[in-house]
Amino acid sequence: MKIDKEISILIDTLKSFFNSENELEENIFDGINWQKMEKVLRYHSIRPILLEQIKKQKIDIPKDFLNRLVKYARYQAVAHLSNELELKEIQKEFALQKITLAPFKRITYQNQLYVDGLREAGDIDLLINRIDLPKAFELFLNRGYIFTNQLHCLNIKQLALDLINAKGNYEIPLNKGLHHIDLHWDISYGFLPYNFPENFILSLENEKDRRNKSHS
């Protein structure tokens, strides 16, 4: 199956990003559909990575397209910083209340696999123990977060209890201004061929503590 040129560029860009020996060809953008290129980059969330590789390898692209990439990269820098600061404040509050909290998915990949905020910022995925939902909801509401319109008018304690006992639903979105949090209390769904122990997040924390002590 023939791959579209725009998709091929995306793949080559990622290869170049993760392995500097795979340099992009100088004429890699010849004959492409720039509108389609922008759509592909937006869908796959690698605009900052493409900009970084273009600058590093001094490849010419249309000025208006370059300007849009630069503008978006600046927005990303602000979004990353804002998310990091918000996450630190949330972690501090949860620690004071003895609630185990684990960031995962996007924000974890961002910190461990990418450099200089090159992964596009988005929501903050957080994982807690199911039993801590009532306290977690209270903390988020006190920080100014709101639920979706359908849930906002419900009794919070009752909502937490319903979710604790629910089957098949393991996350809930919360919003505050530019911040969007997906709060999870499990990471495996009933239709999957595997599951995790009820308190597996505590096991993760214990393992992290063990590793920290072994390196101290």
Model features per residue range: what roles?
Residues 1-122, 128-216:
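Conserved NTP-donor binding/palm subdomain of two-metal-ion nucleotidyltransferases/polymerases, i.e.
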